Amino acid sequence: DHLQALVQDNAQLIRIARPYLMNLFQYLRETKHQITIVDAHGCILDTIFDDGTSQAPPIQYPISNGTIFSEEESGTNGISLCLSLEKPVMVFGPEHFQQRFHNSICYAAPIHDQFHHLIGCVDISGPLANYHPSALTMLESAINSIERELSFRQTNAVLTSALDAFTEG
């Protein structure tokens, strides 16, 4: 399955990002927002939301893992704009191309590896009526922590490999 392969290819990103995003989600829990981890091509890899006891989706439209939010697939949206600009963005209501998102707000911020290559983004989406003025700032802080941990782990893996090669040789 294509989605399983993408998730496996991005397993380290998901594993590192999820705890930071779960912490961030605690501040957004009552606002019916959801948080998605997205690869560099706009494919949703992982989603965090509170389904609680409600049968209704957390926001007005379903977003599931495997959904593609590239500019070509979905028009202007928080994910596609963030990935193309490689900058944090907010997309309000009718700024979305698709009318079904006109009652929504998206906050998205890119994730870069230690070499500053774009590897994906994180998107927070929810009802426009529940606009949260600090959401993008909190997201950027979480992304900063995720990037630092990714860099640390990547550097540690290289050093461990070099040390292993040195001790074996």
Residue ranges of model-derived segments:
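Intrinsically disordered, low-complexity terminal regulatory regions
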Residues: D1-I63, F69, M90, I119-G169
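Fold-independent oxyanion-binding glycine-rich loops
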Residues: A40, L85, G93-E95, A109, ...
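Soluble sensory domains of the PAS superfamily and closely related sensory modules
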Residues: G75-V89
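Membrane-proximal, non-catalytic sensory/regulatory domains of signal-transducing membrane proteins
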Residues: V89-F101
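A short beta-strand signature within small-molecule sensing/ligand-binding domains used
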Residues: R100-P110
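Flexible loop/coil segments at beta-strand boundaries within sensory signal-transduction domains
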Residues: H112-H117
